[in-house]
Amino acid sequence: MKSISKMLCLVDGEHYLPVTQESIDVLNNLEHIDIVAAVFIGGTEKLRDDSEESYSKVLGVPVQFAKNEDIPYDIIVEMINRYDVDTVMDLSDEPILDYPKRFKIACKTLAQGVSYQGPDFKFDPVTQYEIMEKPSIKIIGTGKRIGKTAVSGFVSRLIDKNGYEPCVIAMGRGGPQEPEIVHGEQLEITPEFLLEQSEKGVHAASDHWEDALMSRILTIGCRRCGGGMAGEVFLTNMKKGAKLANQVDSKFAIFEGSGAAIPPIKTNKNIVLIGANQPLNNIIDYFGPYRIGLGDLIILTMCEEPMCNEEKREYIEKFIKEINPKAKIISTVFRPKPLADISGKKVLFATTAPKSIEHELVDYLETNYNCEIVGTTPHLSNRPLLKKDIEKYMDEADIMLTELKAAAVDVATKDSIKAGLDVVYCDNIPVPINYKYPDLSKSVLEIVDEAIEDFNKD
C-alpha cells in the first residue's frame, strides 16, 4: 500500500479557476495524495480575483500568492517546509514557466529533498543512505574530466598527513562487481603490478587504484552505471562499499563521485568541483545550481586560458556566491607532479589535459623537475591515437610519464615497458591561481574538522 504523499501545487492565472479547481480535485481523489497547499506563481489573463482568501476557498487548500511579478522561488521553498511537503506538482505552463524557470524550481525542490513533477516529467531527490558510522565528506563535480580524482588524491594525502586516518570510497564506470579494498599504505604499486592486474581483467586505471597509488592510503573501489540529470545512478554497489568503510581501520571516510554522478551516501560535508573549462550553461543552468548548492567548499578547476578566461571565471564565481553564499570558493589550476625522480631524463608525457595547455605543462615540468620533454600526448582517453603517439616518440624518450587515467595501464604502461622505457606515474596538484584566494590546504582541513563536529553532534 502506498503511503500518503503531501503535495504542494503550483498554479497560475493563465488558467480559468474552475479548470485549476478540477485538476486539484482529480489529484485529491487519488488515495495516496493529499494536497496540502498551493502557490500562485503568476499570470493575470484569466484571473478575476487576486484575493488569497477567495482563491483558497475555491480550491479548498491554502494558497500563497507571489508578492511581485517574478516566480516566487523562495515562497515555494517556504511552503515546502511549512507543510512538510513530499512532492511539488506543477499545474502551470508557458508563458508563466519556461524551461530555465522549471529547472530552477527543480533545483530548489530537490535541495529540500522533495520531488518536482508535472504532466510529463518528474525529478526525484538523489538517494542518500544514512549508514555512516564515522565522519565523512563527499567530493562531487559538475562533469567529467574536471579533476575530481586529482583533488580527491590531494585531499586524501592532506588529511592523512595531518593524522585523520582516512579511507577513500570511489565509484567508477569500470569498478569491480564487489567492493574491492586496495591497501595503498601496504602495497608497492609499480607499473608492472598494475599491468599484471590489468591483464587479469582488473580496470587498473580505475579511480580507487589511482587514489591508492597517489595517496598511499586504503581505498575501496565500487562501480556505477548511468548518471541522471541531478546525479542519481542506475546501478552502484557503493552502499556495500560504505558498509565496508565502516568496518575498516580508518577514522574518516572520503566518498568520491564519478563524472557528475553523486555518491548515494549521506555525508557530513561536501566539496564540490566545478570545471571552468565546461560550457557555461552546464554550470549555471539545468542542475548545475543544485550541485553548487550542495557545496561547503567549492573548488573551481582549470582556471587558465584558453579553457577559461578571467571574465568567465569571475562570472562563475559571482554566480556561485549568489547560489551558495555560505560556501568558500577557491579558483585553481592543475600542475603535474611526478611520483619518482625524472631529473636529467628525456620524457614522453601522457595526459588527459587538452593540447591547448600543453606549453604550460611542459614548461612547468622542465622548470621544476629538470627534465626534457621530447613529446606529449593528450590522448590517454583515445587508445588508437595514444598508440600512435607512443610509437612516434618512443625512440627519443627514456621515460613515459603518465597520469593514471583511462588507457594509462593497458596501453601507455604496456607499450612503454615493451619498448624498454621506464614508466613513472604522475599526479596533478590543484594550485590556487593567486594569493587572493584562501589557503587550499587550510580550507580543506576546516571542512574535515566541521564534518567531525557535525558527526559528533549526531
Curated annotation (Swiss-Prot):
The keyword Cell membrane does not apply. It is an enzyme of class 6 (ligase). The keyword Nucleotide-binding applies. It is found in: Cytoplasm. Its main location: cytoplasm. It catalyses: (2R)-2,3-bisphosphoglycerate + ATP + H(+) = cyclic (2R)-2,3-bisphosphoglycerate + ADP + phosphate. Its EC number is 6.5.1.9. One of its GO terms (cellular component) is cytoplasm. Keywords: ATP-binding, Cytoplasm, Ligase, Nucleotide-binding. GO terms for biological process: gluconeogenesis. GO terms for molecular function: ATP binding; cyclic 2,3-diphosphoglycerate synthetase activity; ligase activity. Belongs to the cyclic 2,3-diphosphoglycerate synthetase family. Catalyzes the formation of cyclic 2,3-diphosphoglycerate (cDPG) by formation of an intramolecular phosphoanhydride bond at the expense of ATP. This is Cyclic 2,3-diphosphoglycerate synthetase. The gene is cpgS.
